[in-house]
Amino acid sequence: MGSSEQELKAIVKDLGCGPYFLGTYDKRFPGFVSPHKLACAIVNTAGRETGGVHWMAFAWNPRSKTCYLFEPFGFSDQRLKQVYQFEYESLLRRSAIASSPDRCITLEKSTQSVQGPNSAACGLFCCMFLHAFANWPQTPMDHNPTMNLITGVPNSMLNSPQVQPTLRRNQEQLYSFLERHSPYFRSHSAQIRSATSFCHLKNM
């Protein structure tokens, strides 16, 4: 089941990302509207009419001219296309950041897995990343107090029994983080935990 758009918007607001948050979008995300403002969004790999499949987060830092793509499984571009039929190159091309004078931007993409293979918590991990971006826009992927709470593993080991305890611990840290920082999460904790559990996809 995973996270609904309503849940993600409420949690992101609680986390203080409101001034920069453009919203939740399906795969037709129009990109960033201003090349001069900090901005972020949560984007689904599928069309809204499907009910959604997998959440990712995009963020734009105009000072460093860096676009961040946080995808909790750390899939390669090829794997994203293979598994979700999702490509982000056209998204970046049609974004306002591509119209900056020198059109030279840096793309920084997550490459490690922080989410378990059967977990449905992708949207919640995106919220966690956006909290890091809102507070440490120069280093949102790591080396900050929020993302330091979780540990990435090589994507090639995503399904390995060896790393499942680490990935499960990441999800427990995620829930604890949201318990501390989001009143909405606290009020709906049981429901959200059930819909995003570590073994949710295996049990479907």
Swiss-Prot record:
Gene3D superfamilies, sorted: Adenoviral Proteinase, Chain A
GO MF terms held by the record: cysteine-type endopeptidase activity; cysteine-type peptidase activity; DNA binding
Coiled-coil regions listed: none
Record site feature (Cleavage), residues: 51-52
Active-site residue numbers: 54, 71, 122
Domain of life assignment: Viruses
Protein name (record): Protease
Organism: Human adenovirus C serotype 2
